């Protein structure tokens, strides 16, 4: 194996040279560029990583990344061939990952010092996350590391990530209406109606909607109704349904309450149907992709987003903000959003290395670099020096180009400095990391600066706003300097913290039934959302209930729910054990 050869060579090299090589030296064969094939279950892109990120990786390691996203039977085909790729990124540390471990398709990171010698930053600073993977893997070995990791000393009870469920609304339109009270979803609906009456089209004359959604991120349920349930009731998606971290209860998606009312998921499917029938839901929602929906948000064709990444992150450009436009938090009084906890254990989206790779050390070096503070900042905000830097106090600051590029990702990177020419010539967007996974949590504390990796936590970003910026009005009305500060101070939220839980395996029969049931749920949910009448909606819901419960002699849905309830019981035990250890 190539590892042994390099270890022997390393023993003959001076200690300082070995250290430098392990930390940041180039890998690969001689001066040539090595192509690493990265199979990612999370990627939305397929092809060669390009732009400034490609230049960074080529300069540091002499590598280029060929990204293969999961689609159709891609994973099955690769599993059957016995070769998953060089670097393998998993959506979760559940069934697919464990099957790959059992099949011997993933490297043992501790074999012949691979982690210790070539993953030095992770080895020295992320032991909790590595040990979590050892427990999850089931064979006592470390095969990878998760995402969203926080530093070892910042996982106290009150620590959480940025609020993803931010309840963002076109605040300029909201102020125009006189900032009416929004107590519940009915009040929010009324606000949407008034906004559309006042602004039926965007600046280009195209029709506006309350929201534009997309189906390509659907899973066991349709994503947007599922997410609205999480944003409103403080329950988090779990197996086939939701987990309530307040009551430790599992809630199945097709629940109908004793009084005949719908459970959380069906209630939100009904809400989206209400939007659809009122002309407030983009009619292309069932056929478009995420990037098409994002383009509509950017152009001002939507009023509302559950998510920060699909609202303010898209619309709040400097130009819009300084023109008095912007999306900001207006959360219904009755809403209790879920927010995700920070933990040194990290999340479940794993970085691993395929067992058939010919470049194990190089793969480890690349993953390790992504895990360093510099690597994390560069993949978020661009090349150090060109886009950001540390000031004399060690605090993170944007360059003028970096600030502009992060606000408008279509900004072309340019520089007169010859050291930065290799990163220039294309837009910031075209160089962004396309693997769709990061090792650190964006909201973790950067040990090199003492601030968060998230630019919202930088002292340098807390600058006075320009006159006319709509955020000034929002801040004054909400007595807060940021949306996260407001949501924290509001105090109504639930932290989702799953600790070392990893989803269990399903047997072959359950896998078949699970796929049938979830397909029924998503298919009929969309039909219900786009029903033209109340009668059509009720028929679609009834068909969903009937079909989902028809499989395996009428026991299929119940089997999926029973399996999910057993998993919820395991999670409950893990949570109780973790909290007991903290006290």
Feature names for model-found ranges:
Residues 2-3, 12, 20, 24-583:
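Extracytoplasmic/secretory soluble proteins
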Residues 17:
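Terminal recognition/anchoring or ligand-binding modules at protein termini
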């Amino acid at each position: 194996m190539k590892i042994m050869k390099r270890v022997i060579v390393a023993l003959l090299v001076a200690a300082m040279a070995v250290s430098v090589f392990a930390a940041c030296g180039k890998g690969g064969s001689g001066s040539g560029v090595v192509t690493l094939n990265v199979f990612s279950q999370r990627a939305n892109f397929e092809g060669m990583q390009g732009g400034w990120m490609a230049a960074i990786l080529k300069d540091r390691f002499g590598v280029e990344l060929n990204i293969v996203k999961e689609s159709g039977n891609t994973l099955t085909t690769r599993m059957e061939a016995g070769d998953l790729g060089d670097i393998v990124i998993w959506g979760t540390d559940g069934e697919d990952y464990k099957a790959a471990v059992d099949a011997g398709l993933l490297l043992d990171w501790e074999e012949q010092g691979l982690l210790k010698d070539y993953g030095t930053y992770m080895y020295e600073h992320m032991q909790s996350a590595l040990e979590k993977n050892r427990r999850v893997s089931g064979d006592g070995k470390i095969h990878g590391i998760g995402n969203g990791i926080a530093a070892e000393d910042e996982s106290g009870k009150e620590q959480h990530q940025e609020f993803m469920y931010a309840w963002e609304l076109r605040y300029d339109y909201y102020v125009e209406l006189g900032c009416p009270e929004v107590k519940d979803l009915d009040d929010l609906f009324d606000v949407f109606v008034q906004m559309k009456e006042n602004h039926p089209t965007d600046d280009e004359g195209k029709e506006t909607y309350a929201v534009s959604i997309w189906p390509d991120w659907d899973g066991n349920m349709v994503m947007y109704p599922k997410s609205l349930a999480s944003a409103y009731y403080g329950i988090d998606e779990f197996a086939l349904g939701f987990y309530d971290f307040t009551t430790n209860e599992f809630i199945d998606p097709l629940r109908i309450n004793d009084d005949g009312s719908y459970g959380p998921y069906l209630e939100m499917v009904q809400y989206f149907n209400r939007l659809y029938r009122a002309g407030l839901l983009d009619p292309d929602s069932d056929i478009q992709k995420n990037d098409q929906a994002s383009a509509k948000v950017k152009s001002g064709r939507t009023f509302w987003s559950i998510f920060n990444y699909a609202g303010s992150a898209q619309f709040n450009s400097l130009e819009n903000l300084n023109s008095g436009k912007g999306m900001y938090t207006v959360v219904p009084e009755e809403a209790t959003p879920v927010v995700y906890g920070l933990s040194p254990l990290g999340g479940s989206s794993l970085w691993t290395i395929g067992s058939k790779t010919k470049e194990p050390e190089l793969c480890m070096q690349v993953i390790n670099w992504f895990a360093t503070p510099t690597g994390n900042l560069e993949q978020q905000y661009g090349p150090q020096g060109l886009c950001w830097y540390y000031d004399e106090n060690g605090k993170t600051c944007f360059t003028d180009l970096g600030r502009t590029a992060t606000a408008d990702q279509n900004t072309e990177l340019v520089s007169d400095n010859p050291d930065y020419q290799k990163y220039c010539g294309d837009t910031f967007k075209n160089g962004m990391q396309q693997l769709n996974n990061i090792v650190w949590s964006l909201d973790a504390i950067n040990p090199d600066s003492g601030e968060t990796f998230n630019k919202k936590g930088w002292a340098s970003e807390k600058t006075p706003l320009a006159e006319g910026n709509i955020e000034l009005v929002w801040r004054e009305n909400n007595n807060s300097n940021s949306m996260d500060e407001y949501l924290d101070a509001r105090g109504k939220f639930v932290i989702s913290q799953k600790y070392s839980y990893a989803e269990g395996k399903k047997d072959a029969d359950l896998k078949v039934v699970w796929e049938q049931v979830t397909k029924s749920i998503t298919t009929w949910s969309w039909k219900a959302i786009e029903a033209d009448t109340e009668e059509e909606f009720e028929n679609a819901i009834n068909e969903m209930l009937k079909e989902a419960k028809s499989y395996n002699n009428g026991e299929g849905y119940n089997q999926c729910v029973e399996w999910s309830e057993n998993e919820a019981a395991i999670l409950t035990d893990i949570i109780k054990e973790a909290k007991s250890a903290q006290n």
